[in-house]
Amino acid sequence: MSAVCGGAARMLRTPGRHGYAAEFSPYLPGRLACATAQHYGIAGCGTLLILDPDEAGLRLFRSFDWNDGLFDVTWSENNEHVLITCSGDGSLQLWDTAKAAGPLQVYKEHAQEVYSVDWSQTRGEQLVVSGSWDQTVKLWDPTVGKSLCTFRGHESIIYSTIWSPHIPGCFASASGDQTLRIWDVKAAGVRIVIPAHQAEILSCDWCKYNENLLVTGAVDCSLRGWDLRNVRQPVFELLGHTYAIRRVKFSPFHASVLASCSYDFTVRFWNFSKPDSLLETVEHHTEFTCGLDFSLQSPTQVADCSWDETIKIYDPACLTIPA
């Protein structure tokens, strides 16, 4: 693997590994985890890459191999060294970056590929949710070797599961059944079902500044905002992508700014509160762009990864000026 620092972008090439997900550490500035797969995730192995910035661009701190493609990654909220990945063999893997050995624990219950995993952000609880092609969401306590609960209701692949950063025990899921669903761990069931698109929904995220606001990204190339107090119509719709939207993320620094990446090879930045909502289009990949994250420490820094075998950290121009 080779690092390049070109212009404002720091880049790491990952030969033979296609990027699926990227997430900045909530603790260490600049540290990035990236979940990758061989052969575009269709066959072969996977590798978890832990990267740090250096003078040359990006430095590989550690890598962990798994015997199937890795599709998502999430950092622990109470231990800076610990993170979880999920894979095509239906399992989740718990890793410790302070150790070069294999996973500390493997959780194998899903019957098909696990496409999404997220660690709860409210410090009072340490829970993980995973979403699978088997149409279920599972709830895990990482200290326990088996799931605590299984949530059923989706009628197709679950592509995205993400905890509310505001409400303990509440998470959202997005599915190929065209719905966004809000779940309550305490009730062990679904609270709200939103028919959000007339197409598969590949991603969702919560606004960091409004506990009632979520965004969905779908195969219909649209982003839609949803206010949980009234879900009959979206509160905003953002158009511009020309192929399916693979991932969407709200900014942790700006209440109305979000980013999306797509199978059209681009990353786009938006401010849904402005009439001209598209702030910037970044075109620096040559394949599907699947992973995307905002830095939690730097208001201007973003990371993405692509099937073109590159990982990039950069500062888009639109984030260096007031949104």
From Swiss-Prot:
Its subcellular locations are: Cytoplasm, Cytosol; Peroxisome matrix
Task: Quote one Gene Ontology molecular function term.
Answer: protein homodimerization activity
Q: Which InterPro entries does this UniProt record tie to the protein?
A: G-protein_beta_WD-40_rep, PEX7, WD40/YVTN_repeat-like_dom_sf, WD40_repeat_CS, WD40_repeat_dom_sf, WD40_rpt
Q: Which CDD domains match?
A: WD40
Q: Which GO terms describe its biological process?
A: endochondral ossification; ether lipid biosynthetic process; fatty acid beta-oxidation; neuron migration; peroxisome organization; protein import into peroxisome matrix; protein targeting to peroxisome
Q: Which UniProt keywords apply?
A: Cataract, Cytoplasm, Deafness, Disease variant, Ichthyosis, Peroxisome, Peroxisome biogenesis disorder, Protein transport, Repeat, Retinitis pigmentosa, Rhizomelic chondrodysplasia punctata, Transport, WD repeat
Please give the GO cellular component terms listed in this UniProt entry.
Answer: cytosol; peroxisomal matrix; peroxisomal membrane; peroxisome
WD repeats (start-end)? 65-96, 109-141, 153-184, 196-227, 240-271, 284-315
Q: Which Pfam families match?
A: WD40
Domain of life according to the entry:
Eukaryota
> What tissue specificity does the UniProt entry give?
Ubiquitous. Highest expression in pancreas, skeletal muscle and heart.
Q: What is the effect of changing E200R?
A: Impaired binding to cargo proteins containing a PTS2 peroxisomal targeting signal
Q: PANTHER family from the xrefs?
A: PEROXISOMAL TARGETING SIGNAL 2 RECEPTOR (PTHR46027:SF1)
Q: How does it assemble?
A: Interacts with PEX5; interaction only takes place when PEX7 is associated with cargo proteins. Interacts with VWA8.
The disorder on record is: Peroxisome biogenesis disorder complementation group 11: A peroxisomal disorder arising from a failure of protein import into the peroxisomal membrane or matrix. The peroxisome biogenesis disorders (PBD group) are genetically heterogeneous with at least 14 distinct genetic groups as concluded from complementation studies. Include disorders are: Zellweger syndrome (ZWS), neonatal adrenoleukodystrophy (NALD), infantile Refsum disease (IRD), and classical rhizomelic chondrodysplasia punctata (RCDP).
Quote the function comment for this protein. Receptor required for the peroxisomal import of proteins containing a C-terminal PTS2-type peroxisomal targeting signal. Specifically binds to cargo proteins containing a PTS2 peroxisomal targeting signal in the cytosol. Cargo protein-binding triggers interaction with PEX5 and formation of a ternary complex composed of PEX5 and PEX7 along with PTS2-containing cargo proteins, which is tranlocated into peroxisomes by passing through the PEX13-PEX14 docking complex.
Similarity comment: family membership? Belongs to the WD repeat peroxin-7 family.
Q: This protein is called what?
A: Peroxisomal targeting signal 2 receptor
Organism expressing this protein natively? Homo sapiens
Q: What does UniProt list as this organism's lineage?
A: Eukaryota, Metazoa, Chordata, Craniata, Vertebrata
